[in-house]
Amino acid sequence: MNKDNLIQNYAVALFNNALLDNIQVTIFEEITLLNRIIEDSFDIKEFLISPIVNKIDKINVINSLIKNTKLNKIVNNFLLLLIKNSRTHILSNIVEAYNKLLYESRNIKIVQVISSNQLQPREQEWIQYRIEKELQQKTALFFDIDNTIIGGIVIKYDNVLRDYSIKGSLEKIAKCLKNVKVC
């Protein structure tokens, strides 16, 4: 099984468990917090992904840490399952896939907007308005900065890429010029 399918399977299983109790958002918040704690602590991360540390030791340490928290039982069991199956290294990917499932369940499309510099709030609102009007669907926009696009924006959602950047335009012009023959 490839890594993407594995990640998706874990995310779907977690989402379906949360759906049974109608606590999808709570579970998302808790696994996001848990992931942030693991990612921010080099020692915890290394401990959890280390093949040298016995799984039983990992489970005992996590159980003692979890005992003092108010994490949902679903999240506790999920983390223990990841440890048991040596999958803690894909937790951040699972959180991302779970987030997508959460948006999809609310009929919200995730859209990534890349610009060469930070966009002003009014620009972000205008872009969101235009995209929602075109897609006829609510969107959740995530803005990233990539100064290599020189100017303009690049919009990504599903398998669609809309390149309105200067870099993209220059590449299209260069491609066309390669096909031009000078007599």
Swiss-Prot record:
**Looking at the UniProt record for this protein, which Gene Ontology cellular component terms does it annotate, in alphabetical order?**
plasma membrane; proton-transporting ATP synthase complex
Q: How does it sit in the membrane?
A: Peripheral membrane protein
Q: Where in the cell is it found?
A: Cell inner membrane
Annotated transmembrane regions? none
One GO MF annotation is: proton-transporting ATP synthase activity, rotational mechanism
Q: Which InterPro entries match?
A: ATP_synth_OSCP/delta_N_sf (IPR026015), ATPase_OSCP/dsu (IPR000711)
**Gene3D superfamilies, alphabetized:** N-terminal domain of the delta subunit of the F1F0-ATP synthase
| Disulphide bond pairs | none
Could you tell me which Pfam families the record lists for this protein?
OSCP
Keywords assigned by UniProt, alphabetized: ATP synthesis, Cell inner membrane, Cell membrane, CF(1), Hydrogen ion transport, Ion transport, Membrane, Transport
User: Family, per the entry?
Assistant: Belongs to the ATPase delta chain family.
Q: How does it assemble?
A: F-type ATPases have 2 components, F(1) - the catalytic core - and F(0) - the membrane proton channel. F(1) has five subunits: alpha(3), beta(3), gamma(1), delta(1), epsilon(1). F(0) has three main subunits: a(1), b(2) and c(10-14). The alpha and beta chains form an alternating ring which encloses part of the gamma chain. F(1) is attached to F(0) by a central stalk formed by the gamma and epsilon chains, while a peripheral stalk is formed by the delta and b chains.
PANTHER family linked to this entry: ATP SYNTHASE DELTA CHAIN
Q: What does this protein do?
A: F(1)F(0) ATP synthase produces ATP from ADP in the presence of a proton or sodium gradient. F-type ATPases consist of two structural domains, F(1) containing the extramembraneous catalytic core and F(0) containing the membrane proton channel, linked together by a central stalk and a peripheral stalk. During catalysis, ATP synthesis in the catalytic domain of F(1) is coupled via a rotary mechanism of the central stalk subunits to proton translocation. This protein is part of the stalk that links CF(0) to CF(1). It either transmits conformational changes from CF(0) to CF(1) or is implicated in proton conduction.
The entry's protein name is ATP synthase subunit delta
